[in-house]
Amino acid sequence: RDAQESRGLGDVYKRQAQASPIYMYQRLEKPGQRWGLFGVISLIGNIALMAFYTVVTGWILYYFVKFLIGSNADFGFAQMIADPGLNVTYLLVVLIAAFVLLSFNLQGGLERVTKYMMSALLVLMLVLAVHSLTFAGAAEGLRFYLVPDFSAIDGGVIVAAMNQAFFSLSVGMGGMAIFGSYIGKDRALMGESVHVILLDTFVAVLAGIIIFPACFTYGLEVTAGPSLLFDTMAGVFNHMAGGRWWGTLFFLFMVFAALS
């Protein structure tokens, strides 16, 4: 409920202003108020987010290229991030691609393509989830993923959960405000918020169903952090019939998801 209200309020204010986060506060504030400061904070938050988001997008692009050319024998997340030249190269490619895309009409071009790409990614994730359920370690992986262990909950876990919630809601960086500016005034904001929350949660649960059975099947460390997605998915595709092409499609869709 709190997530729904947080998203809904951001969309309401932004749709009313029809402007970027910085100008949104300036347009809605009354004389003598200084809400514009929060627009600057949102801008700083976006810059901080992009500082690592562009790097992660470069990692995704790297895996897409590796699967596309069929050179997946030397995959290894640790080796990849240890190569600064490789990381900087893919980072620059991502930045250039982002600037080029932003120079076009987003609603007329990128938005239309993204709708199809994200639908295809969702279908592919459903296929991969079903495939993961056939792994030898599926039962153990699902038990680890879905059966709660309340004894493991401590302050660190709570803080990590809150960090994830704030990240998903784009709290503090004007994310909801940006999305709200593109919502037509004929759309019901509460309904849109509910749909986004449900879809976001569904995709997150689906990702867990894909990843954790594979971890227990291939002996991967479930607490590996950012490398979990890349190492796990590479292992899944390497053991699938036609895995090279499944992997190519998956990381292609992920590239579009990250860029959008």
Segments (PLM) and residue ranges:
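Single conserved hydrophobic/aromatic residue that forms the stacking wall/gate
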Residues: 2-13
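Membrane-water interface of transmembrane alpha-helices
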Residues: 14-19
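Membrane-embedded translocation segments of transport machinery
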Residues: 111, 115-259
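Membrane-embedded alpha-helical segments of transport systems
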Residues: 7, 44-54, 198-207
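Alpha-helical transmembrane segments
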Residues: 48-51, 55-62, 100, 124-127, ...
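Residues within membrane-spanning alpha-helices of integral membrane proteins
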Residues: 8, 40-46, 91, 95, ...
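Inter-helical loop and helix-membrane interface segments of multi-pass membrane transporters/permeases
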Residues: 21-44, 54-107, 136-160, 226-230
